[in-house]
Structure formats: C-alpha cells, structure tokens
Design a protein with these regions (language model features):
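Active-site metal-binding loops of divalent metal-dependent hydrolases
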Residues: 100-101, 208
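Ser/Thr-centric signal marking residues that sit
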Residues: 34, 101-103, 117-120, 182, ...
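HTH-adjacent hinge/linker in prokaryotic transcriptional regulators
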Residues: 2-8, 14-22, 27, 33-99, ...
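Alpha-helix N-cap/helix-start and coil->helix boundary motif
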Residues: 103-104, 123-126, 235
Length: 251
C-alpha cells in the first residue's frame, strides 16, 4: 500500500536523518522510479529535502514556527467558527474533534457540565477536555508530533474501528470542489480519512482563507460533508455546490 510505504519511509528517514536513493530502493523493495515518486511526495510535504545522491530529514524545529503562525492567523474568525460549531454538541454525543487551529476553539463554547464522549488526537483538545467533569475522553495515536501538536500512528485505525462516532468536527488546509477537504500531513490524513468515512455526520470548520484551495492530500469529498462552519459566505461555486448537495453552511 503506497500510503503505508510512504509512512514507513518517513519513519526511517526521521530515525536515520539521511538516506541514499539506492538504500531506500533496496530497503522497500521497489523500483527506482517508485522510490523517486515517493521521495518527491515527501519533499512536497516538507518532511525531507533532496541532497546529492539522496535525501535528508527537515527537522521539526525548523517547521514549528509554522504552527504558531497558523495559530494566530485569522484568530478572531476561528473563534467565531468554534462558537458556531459548538451548538452542534449535544448530551450523550460521541464526537471526534480533529487537530487544528480552528477546532481548538470548539470546546471554549460548550457547557462544561454536559455529558458526552470525545475522541481526538489533538493535544490542545486533550488539555481543554480535562476541564469537563462529565466527559469521557479517548486519545488516539502512538506518538506525538510537535509540528501539528497531535498524536499520530498508522495503527490508530485499529482502535478507531471500535468506536461509533455520530459527529466529526474536522479541520482542513484546503476546501474546494474538485479535491474536497485536503491537508498536507500524510500521517494525519490517514486518520482523517478513516474518521470521515466512519462518522454519521461530518462537519468542516474552516475560515475563508481555506476556501477554493487544495493541498497535497484529499481525505474527504466535499459532497460527503453534512455542515460547513466558516466566517464568511463561501465563494459562489462552493456555495452553489453546498446548496445542490444539501450541505448546510453557517457563517
């Protein structure tokens, strides 16, 4: 499976810091063209960079500022979106809250005495949920990824199979008609894909800067979401698409 192989290549590179193309080809038993395509995908994801004869990892410390920057961009809009979406959380719900700089505001507007279940891979959601007296909390993911402040791991899907999720609150770095909801992190994309395929309802929380954009990896078709929470009326094509597919839009 390509996604699993790329995940394993990423893990290998992060552990060893550098690798030659031939070393990777032999280790993963694929053709030179296949390994080059895999490398190009990791380069596009800003995980590795090409050097003479091979690749080397881009350290997370060089990318951490990106999260901090995202966290302050359109911060007021993200709070408004969080408040709008919080109205969807009801007693006895079993919900998934995605990692992201918009979804982190969701719990700020929920009654702290409400009884419901949260499943998440977000460190920020974990910290906020700990303040809720009547919440049952499940954390997925085998290792912590500082750049996204999330827990990741390819085996998370095995745990997710056990959960019946009625509402998923998702984030995205791109929202458009052709490529749906997208992001740029392979490990997170696998979890997002599984969650949106399993949840009864999928809600996207995304500000206007994400609309019309597409990034590396699609995890959900736009037609598969149930509600969109944003800060401005979406572009005409997206708004018309939502009307056509009975997707409620809140802003």
């Amino acid at each position: 499976m390509k996604a699993k192989r790329i995940y394993e290549i990423e893990s290998f590179i992060k552990e060893n810091k550098t690798a030659s193309i031939e070393e990777l080809r032999q280790r993963f038993n694929v053709s030179i063209n296949t390994i080059r395509r895999d490398i190009n995908q990791l380069v596009d994801m800003n995980i590795v960079k090409k050097v003479y004869g091979g690749i080397e990892v881009i350290e997370d410390s060089h990318k951490a500022v990106d999260y901090n920057k995202r966290n302050i961009e359109n911060s007021n809009s993200k709070k408004i979106i969080g408040e709008l979406a919080a109205n969807e959380i009801e007693a006895n719900d079993i919900i998934y809250i995605d990692t992201g700089t918009t979804t982190i505001h969701l719990l700020d507007y929920v009654d702290k005495h409400l009884t419901f279940t949260i499943i998440t891979n977000s460190l920020d959601i974990l910290n906020k949920a700990s303040q809720f007296k009547n919440v049952t909390l499940f954390i997925i993911g085998e290792k912590y990824k500082p750049i996204t402040r999330s827990f990741i791991g390819i085996d998370s899907n095995m745990l997710l199979e056990k959960f019946n999720i009625n509402k998923s609150f998702m984030s995205a770095t791109g929202v458009n008609i052709q490529n749906g909801l997208s992001n740029s992190e392979m490990e997170e994309n696998l979890i997002k894909q599984y969650i949106t395929s399993k949840a009864t309802e999928t809600f996207i929380l995304a500000d206007h800067s994400k609309m019309g954009k597409s990034t590396l990896l699609t995890y959900c078709d736009l037609s598969d979401i149930n509600k969109m929470f944003t800060d401005k009326i979406p572009p005409k094509d997206i708004n018309a698409f939502c009307q056509e597919h009975n997707i409620a839009v809140y802003f």
